[in-house]
């Protein structure tokens, strides 16, 4: 049975007019529809997405629903802008269900303009522990959590924008020699303990490191700026864009601006004093950063709490020698 996707979106977005933490309780059947329909769309599109600018890129959201709505208030609700999200929609925050349902609804409504990559928290072994399973169980059922798992197992893991900006949740892999390898990953798939898929969602850049190192997370690797440079040169790319780590200013460059980390959950978990950021890429691949400050006392967004960072604009010229 098909559901009215516009009505579902309206129900979810209407929350912006109420208290920031107000729950939106869709029916079990509506959520199953969102999962099964978006799953089909994910499978109809490549594992490595080939996208075109202009678009806006967002990092981790982690169940911070009111902050997701603030990002859309600022960047424009779809279809006013094209979006690429880099994963980690669920866990830790209080409203993972609202976050993932709205993102899936937009994916269904605008399949060619709205894109969602898989993060390390879109795997059952992780979101079983860090909050999403408990939220599903408390508000709906374990069965519904399993329906989400079936959908997560089909999400794409990487994207290339205009053949120049390579995007993923985590980072590079020592096993990644050709981008075609990503295309060949068979879905549905769970996360392996090692290898290419694991690294794409788990690895981290590390300052003062040359080559590959052990990751303190106990999974995957860390990599140095030299690894980034060699990879970009080999594949004729200009920039790696990833999420996965809290950064104080919402975005942080690494290795002579050859890699950028974007994190979009301000005041993460209520414990970090970070701002969130969203990266806008225009037709000329000029990247600018929009900063989302923590909402004071969780008020609705005001113009004073969001401002564009003009000084941190990075021009990506379409050449190897960026």
UniProtKB/Swiss-Prot annotation:
EC class (word): hydrolase
Binding positions (Mn(2+) 1): 60, 62, 88
Q: Which GO terms describe its biological process?
A: cell division; chromosome segregation; positive regulation of establishment of cell polarity regulating cell shape; regulation of mitotic cell cycle; signaling
Name the keywords, alphabetized. Cell cycle, Cell division, Hydrolase, Manganese, Metal-binding, Mitosis, Protein phosphatase
SUPFAM superfamilies, per database record: Metallo-dependent phosphatases
Q: How is the cofactor bound?
A: Binds 2 manganese ions per subunit.
| Cofactor dependence | Mn(2+)
Q: Which residues bind Mn(2+) 2?
A: 88, 120, 169, 244
Q: What does this protein do?
A: Essential role in cell cycle control. PP1 is perhaps required for exit from mitosis.
What family does the database annotate? Answer: Belongs to the PPP phosphatase family. PP-1 subfamily.
Which named protein is this? Serine/threonine-protein phosphatase PP1-2
Naturally occurring in which organism (per UniProt): Schizosaccharomyces pombe (strain 972 / ATCC 24843)
Gene name per UniProt: sds21
């Amino acid at each position: 049975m098909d559901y009215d996707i516009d009505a579902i979106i309206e129900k979810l977005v209407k929350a912006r007019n109420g208290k920031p933490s107000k729950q939106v309780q869709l029916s079990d059947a509506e959520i199953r529809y969102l999962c099964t329909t978006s799953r089909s769309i994910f499978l109809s599109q490549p594992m490595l997405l080939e996208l075109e600018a202009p678009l806006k890129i967002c990092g981790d959201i982690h169940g911070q629903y009111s902050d997701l709505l603030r990002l859309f208030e600022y960047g424009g609700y779809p279809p006013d802008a094209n979006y690429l999200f880099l994963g980690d929609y669920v866990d830790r925050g209080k409203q993972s269900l609202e976050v993932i349902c709205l993102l899936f609804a937009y994916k269904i409504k605008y399949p060619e303009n709205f894109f969602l990559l898989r993060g390390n928290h879109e795997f059952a072994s992780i979101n079983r522990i860090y909050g999403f399973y408990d939220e599903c169980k408390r508000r709906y059922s374990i069965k519904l959590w399993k329906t989400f798992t079936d959908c997560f197992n089909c999400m794409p893991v990487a994207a290339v924008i205009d053949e120049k900006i390579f995007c993923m949740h985590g980072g590079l892999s020592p096993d990644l020699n050709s981008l075609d390898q990503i295309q060949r990953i068979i879905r549905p798939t769970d996360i392996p303990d090692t290898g290419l898929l694991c690294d794409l969602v788990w690895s981290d850049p590390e300052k003062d490191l040359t080559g590959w190192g052990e990751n303190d997370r106990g999974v995957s690797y860390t990599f140095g700026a030299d690894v980034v440079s060699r990879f970009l040169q080999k594949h004729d790319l200009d920039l790696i864009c990833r999420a996965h780590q809290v950064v104080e200013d919402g975005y942080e460059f690494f290795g002579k601006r050859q890699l950028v980390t974007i994190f979009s959950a301000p005041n993460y978990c209520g414990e970090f004093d970070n701002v969130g950021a969203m990266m806008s890429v225009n037709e000329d691949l000029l990247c600018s950063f929009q900063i989302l400050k923590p909402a004071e006392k969780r008020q609705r967004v005001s113009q004073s709490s969001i401002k564009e960072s003009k000084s941190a604009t990075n021009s990506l010229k379409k050449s190897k020698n960026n």
